[in-house]
């Protein structure tokens, strides 16, 4: 029986995808946490901004808090959206493997000739026994199209 397990492990190592969906990936989210804008003002939902997050396995249950920041041209920096830009804390997983999740926000579209520049600010926590065992803070960035459902942006620009 042990030789069967060794042969299955050898086949899985030599032939990518040999076990199809039977074997979960080592980390569905990758080795490092990431966040990306995966929805940006689509025609079917004007003003919608979606943030997708990938969170690796870790020491405890996985929690995320996604917030939206807008670019304030007057100050030359991003600031938290005052209303409607906090998704609250969401539990994503047990910590045993990498997970993905996210939140979609809805904002009023700007007046003609104006624009909103938005990005996600994400706090990730791994929790065990009522305490935080690890914390990370990241902002959205591009480069995760395959993980984020086809769209991966650092920011969302909504202009009219």
Q: Which stretches of residues belong to each language-model region?
A:
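Extended, solvent-exposed regions of the mature portions of secreted/cell-surface glycoproteins
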Residues: 111-116, 122-133
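Signal that preferentially marks extracellular ectodomain short beta-strand elements
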Residues: 98-114
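Contiguous beta-strand segments within globular domains
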Residues: 41-54, 61
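C-terminal region of N-terminal signal peptides and the immediate post-cleavage residues
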Residues: 3-33
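Solvent-exposed serine/threonine-rich low-complexity stretches and specific carbohydrate-binding patches
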Residues: 79-98
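Non-catalytic, glycine-rich low-complexity segments
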Residues: 32-42
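Short beta-strand elements
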Residues: 128-160
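Short beta-strand segments and strand-loop junctions that repeat across beta-rich extracellular domains
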Residues: 62-84, 117-125
